[in-house]
Amino acid sequence: MMKIKIIFSYDGSAFLGSATQPHKKGVQDVLSEALSHLGIFSPLLMASRTDKGVHASYAVASVECGDHFVNLEYLQKQLNKFSHPFIHIKKIEKVKDDFEVRFDVKSREYRYIFSHSSYSPFMASYVYFYPKFDLGKANELLGFFVGKKDLKFFCKSGGDNKTTLREIFIARAYAYKDFSIFHFKANGFLRGQIRLSVASVLKVLEGKMSEKELKEQIEAKKQCNHFLAPPNGLYLSRICY
């Protein structure tokens, strides 16, 4: 047996989440079924979990398979055949037997995409349509998140985290064409953390929440915002080992 790392992307609007779901509507379910068509029945392990409607341009999974799969490019081609059209396998690599796809991760990155153009139903599942805002101010507010923080008030219930401490390496906003993008990089994320963070920054920009309240929530003093930004604008964009 050998262990392989699968790098892939997926359209989150087609799934109930990335993890195994009832009625097999999770990304993990579809990818596991595709592997079974190729005679690979070992448990598929995922590096990250995303909620319903959240996308991934760069996700990672691992699985054990027979040593006879020596042509990984052929395996990639066949796996794409069975996971099409909402999952795309970008690369398959052989890894060491002790590789831990989840616990060996050094950092994860997410991007949240806003569109400031006219509403289009064809884009509605992939961006958050939102009026233009002060990008400089957004950058300033996002900067409050950088560093080692106890983000217990930026966490949905139901997570399996042993601690709510996280180190945020990057939290910034930038423009690309008619889009504004929030970029987050950290050693790990809590369930719902980014969507709660995005919604909190937007509330300050809208004047519905003060900077002081945002800082108090980041400093784990009190929760001032309970609302989450919609999932459709969020993308898992990088996982580093």
UniProtKB/Swiss-Prot annotation:
- Isomerase in keyword set: yes
- GO molecular function: any one? RNA binding
This protein's UniProt keywords:
Isomerase, tRNA processing
Superkingdom of source: Bacteria
Q: Which Pfam families match?
A: PseudoU_synth_1 (PF01416)
This enzyme's EC code(s): 5.4.99.12
Q: Where does substrate bind?
A: Y110
An individual GO BP term: tRNA pseudouridine synthesis
Catalyzed reactions: uridine(38/39/40) in tRNA = pseudouridine(38/39/40) in tRNA
* Isomerase among keywords: yes
Q: Which InterPro entries does the entry mention?
A: PsdUridine_synth_cat_dom_sf, PsdUridine_synth_TruA, PsdUridine_synth_TruA_a/b_dom, PsdUridine_synth_TruA_C, TruA/RsuA/RluB/E/F_N
Subunit details for this protein? Homodimer.
| Function field | Formation of pseudouridine at positions 38, 39 and 40 in the anticodon stem and loop of transfer RNAs.
Family statement drawn from the similarity comment of this UniProt entry: Belongs to the tRNA pseudouridine synthase TruA family.
Q: What is this protein called?
A: tRNA pseudouridine synthase A
Taxonomic lineage from the root: Bacteria, Pseudomonadati, Campylobacterota, Epsilonproteobacteria, Campylobacterales
